[in-house]
Amino acid sequence: MKKITLLLYVFCICSNIYSQQIKKNVKKTITEYPELEAVIKHYKKNGNKEKLQAAYFLIANIGNKGTYTNDLVDSKGISVGYDISNFKDETAEKKWLDSVTAVRGKLHEKETFLPDLKNSTAPFLINNIDRAFEVRQKSPFCKDLTDAEFYEYILPYRVGTEKLEYWRDQVLNDFSASQKDSIYSFSTVLAATSYIDKIYQKKFQFGGNRYFKEKKVRSYSELLQDKSGKCDDMCNLMVFALRALGIPSGFDGIQYKRASNDVGHGWCFVLDTKTKKNYPFDALSNNGPGFFNLPYKNAPKVLRKQFALISPNSIKNDQSVIHPNLFEDNSLDVTSEYFETTNLTIPLEKKYQGPIYLSIWNNGWWKPVDYSYDTNQTTAIFNNVSKENLYCLTKYRYFSTEEASEPFIINKFGEIKHINSLPSKKDINLNEYKNKELKNAKNNAKILEFDTKKEICKKIVEENITKNEWSIISENHLKTNTLYHFVDEPNNMYKIFLLKNDGSVDWY
């Protein structure tokens, strides 16, 4: 993932080296939208240069930010009033949906986008900027905070695609004067964060896996009203609170877990301005900052949400070129803060017109996590790549991902080891392997060849005659140091694995 440029931080602080084109674009944006122009005029009139620079930063990075509203409607486009928080579980939710469908017919999702350029108001942005500067002055945890850190971890007026509201005022009103005094009396940002986290643990909780399908990003008031959600909701709630109270904070997360079809995971971090160190933590959990242990082995990428946009020259802005997973993605690659990483330079056998992607196996196919692009490229370059993981170079054409190389492993030394070149491929009996996942596989689980997907063996479980073993159904034998598919369709498990000579198994 290429390093993100903080657009207006550079514009304001290092204007001599920043492109004139960006300045023109910002000026044009302000001229086209009177509400934004009113913000600039307000701070110019007041003569407050610091707030004026902050206003320029927000406006320069509004870009395509906005609010997504997701509604369930009938065939006439009329809302049926669906709200996931109204149901205690999936059974109740399904019962309600069935009853509505019986009367209103087939339902479908309607998504509407409200761009901030057209819908944000001058009073809202001015309030956000003023409150951010007030808390910067008041909070001891903003001492020694640089402008760049302030712009990213205190100043932003939104955290995602939630509806716009005066959330800073709401947070401050939710805390009593004595609670605020307690927060600012702590000697460390970790203790203050833990105190705030415990308060919100009483107000919000994880709502279960059914929330994973929920696309709507809820505002601060909506989260407190609904009282439950997924990990992203918990992170958003904490970041709203922390930023409003003057604790620099943000979000990190992984899109793909190694050897899992599960959804990704997100968590928060706070910045200690004394040490200039980020302390990650799972929001609304008993383990506060300083006690975080990422429970997923070697995720390919850890990304940090940024408010600042990517460079306008990046191909990520070109939907006709870049894979949709990376389109307009302004996240910052922070993988090395969590895992051992290496930088890769891979020779290419031929030149490719489009980007070459570094991909990881997930849910039945290769999913891109990074890209390399140069019109005259003879090598693919990827930085900050997590070690001890399986990757493949892929290309994206006609809305499909195709392999551009054979799979390879990045070992603990940062070396590329192609699967076909791994030594000592030995015939083995799968039933002799002590691996827990293979031993406990369900009835009719299958092992397939990686390339051909030809079935090699199947798990046979017969309780009456206490049979529980892998049965070979192919003339081909299983071999060590070879990739295979593990398929358990009833349980929706599609992973790949490699049997090692020492009897262990690596899952990818």
Predicted regions: what is each one?
Residues E340-K350, I428-N440:
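A short, amphipathic beta-strand motif
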Residues V26-I30, H42-G47, S182-I199, Y211-S221, ...:
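Hydrophobic/aromatic-rich core segments of domains that either
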Residues M1-I22:
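Bacterial Sec-dependent N-terminal signal peptides
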Residues P355-Y373, K446-E462:
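Short amphipathic beta-strand segments in non-cytosolic proteins
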Residues K316-T342:
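Beta-strand-rich domain onsets/edges
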Residues R397-P423, P490-Y508:
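Structured interaction patches on ligand/partner-binding surfaces of diverse proteins
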Residues P34-A38, N46-D226:
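Secondary-structure boundary elements
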Residues T378-F399, E469-P490:
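Short Pro-Gly-centered beta-turn/loop motif in secreted/extracellular proteins
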